[in-house]
């Protein structure tokens, strides 16, 4: 049969992920956009935007880009190399059951996982309520007054507790005591944090080794890592008598049965909520918590959700006490924390809502009963259980049989914990089944059935909990799944995430989080691996981590990658510690000065302070560039003591600075190292490499450039890349290489989300990643071109171009019309948009970053909204609109405004359906403008009483 002459094969590639799925504008749309910007080709725009002196010469290449199906097959092949045995290792990581209604409707739901940190409260009411539930849960379980909305992991939370204790203690001591029964990774991270700050760390038995007068605080583990359940009340009283602070690392599941840290008198409680429905995932991500007494709440690190009111007086939630945080206080902040673990905290809070106090208590009781049954069988075999009282963990002396028993357990499909050279630890959880107990007994040489023993309890009677918890009605809702599903849906409908609209936040890179990238994170081969499982059970993880590290080295020009930092801020901290340890190894103990431009992100100076460095600010020029003359002067002035400089590239002003190589050369000439903040790496991938420019170390925000979703404020990943000379000083880990310097609880931070970044790289290929960078730059320049004339673009390069983001100056509107940047941001909500980054790095401005994933239609819709807002401001200037009663000042408008009594001098239609807003699928804010001052002056950080919910519904 002959082929008809009119039939032609198409070259269209339906599964070309990079160009058909990830990159928003079509080729035809790009041509239109380039004309608007003033260029004939994308390469012409890049040549005019990126200095030739920094552009990489060789293209970024690593094999053929895969389709979604091919990448998923590759991920499946890799995942199958992992062995998801039943891990009873414990040590802060436990098996748990994620209720399917939570997995499907939160963890796998883009309405939850693509949202940003809730800085704009009006469009974040759903997750703010879920986080308030989390805080209420933690306060109830710990018996303390105020809890934050999550921290990165238990070990870093412990380090934060130590730092907080030093801030608030009246004791003048410079040492911190750590219970030797704390988890080893917790002790290691505390030691890392303390060393550059000059604090001593004393590790020992608190009942024999603690001298309260010689420390500013102490941390106790409850229950201990080896299972001990102890009453710390006398020790806490002794610490208070010495004006020191008491912190307790507590397992929230155990607190359902045990006396709370607050009832013992503790000032601070920290821990992990992982076993509340969040898989172990080879170490993370998980939501840690911190709760404190009311008197010291203003020194607490991390996000804090509080209750306020909106302009109508209705209840509304917001982030409270933000003046404590790094983006405002910089090196004087309580911490460098930026990203937390919001998505995981939401899951944990919903786990509590799903089960209620009765269900949670039943789970805790069952875990304890199974542990008692296990202990009875082992005792019958002649083994002595080390802690007489325990919750879920027991430790046994087995002598020379340790290796034999551990191997026998693995043969039974069970991992046990190796403790020293002669002991074994066993920790049970809600996934432990009768068959698991029988398998463990067989590994120890027994042949029992669960029915051979009668359960009882082995908790100390004096520590049994009698106080109530989770009394708020939200934890007593109807358990029907239909109700749970609808509650989750109601909350998500109050929020604005990427599933509804572009989120053009500058310096945040809110790009597509493709479904194909997300799918593998819930596969048990990735989600059910314990971080301290034998290495031969995680070969798939190691293959993925190694390959992703190689790709990141190719992208950055560095020689080695550490995956341990589990946020961008942690990456900064780890990178600076790497530099510090490099200088110390050379004997240059005096090199402690860090030069940082005044325009830097607040985490930079906060991280430098944590690393024991003296921050010396460097001026910025009027065009936003680093003042090279001032930089040279400061480098010469501090030459002897210069440790490093921290710069962001492209700059925080959204421009490729021409002098970046000179900055690196000056720093090196004075013996310093260069830390190049990778926050803006989305403008460099495939075009320029930090390691080629002269940088020595960078962190990469995988939750920005490499597609891990922001999760409403976490999780994130901040791996660091370094040049070869810094490789020996990368973070170590007590459970892997035994080296010091750990910055996170798990060796690879939050590895269960690494499949997202890896699959992104596989599906894009080097060519696709390069194209994504170019289109990100095009999209930003297109917005800048369209808005020029209505607004001033504050900073551009010598060629008049911006990088991947642009800063729009709204300050003239305040002078001419009384319209603030806040008014513009809230009016964008009426148009169905999350506002760009407000007042950073310049007060009164908006920083816009569209990313490569947004289509021309969405960019045009945003520009239409911004231009319409400018026209509304012009109407105020011309006297056609009232200066105080107008759509900008009253934004955002709600359904209650629309259907209620209308007495405003503009129409309902103008209020609620401005240009850019969808008429059919319009997003409605659930509250009017939130009163920030009221929220901080009347701080409430737990769920309001049910009467307020009833009143709001009337």
UniProtKB/Swiss-Prot annotation:
Q: Which UniProt keywords apply?
A: Oxidoreductase, Pyridoxal phosphate
The domain of life for this entry's organism is: Bacteria
The record's Gene Ontology biological-process terms are:
glycine decarboxylation via glycine cleavage system
What Gene Ontology molecular-function terms does this entry list?
glycine binding; glycine dehydrogenase (decarboxylating) activity; pyridoxal phosphate binding
Catalytic EC class? oxidoreductase
A GO CC term attached to the entry: glycine cleavage complex
Residues bearing the modification N6-(pyridoxal phosphate)lysine = 704
What's the catalysed reaction?
N(6)-[(R)-lipoyl]-L-lysyl-[glycine-cleavage complex H protein] + glycine + H(+) = N(6)-[(R)-S(8)-aminomethyldihydrolipoyl]-L-lysyl-[glycine-cleavage complex H protein] + CO2
Q: What is its EC number?
A: 1.4.4.2
Give cofactor(s), names only.
pyridoxal 5'-phosphate
Cross-referenced InterPro entries? GcvP, GDC-P_C, GDC-P_N, GDC_P, PyrdxlP-dep_Trfase, PyrdxlP-dep_Trfase_major, PyrdxlP-dep_Trfase_small
Q: Its biological function?
A: The glycine cleavage system catalyzes the degradation of glycine. The P protein binds the alpha-amino group of glycine through its pyridoxal phosphate cofactor; CO(2) is released and the remaining methylamine moiety is then transferred to the lipoamide cofactor of the H protein.
The cross-references to NCBIfam families, in alphabetical order and at most eight, read: gcvP, PRK00451.1
Assembly description: The glycine cleavage system is composed of four proteins: P, T, L and H.
Family note: Belongs to the GcvP family.
Q: What is this protein called?
A: Glycine dehydrogenase (decarboxylating)
Q: Lineage of the native species?
A: Bacteria, Pseudomonadati, Pseudomonadota, Alphaproteobacteria, Hyphomicrobiales
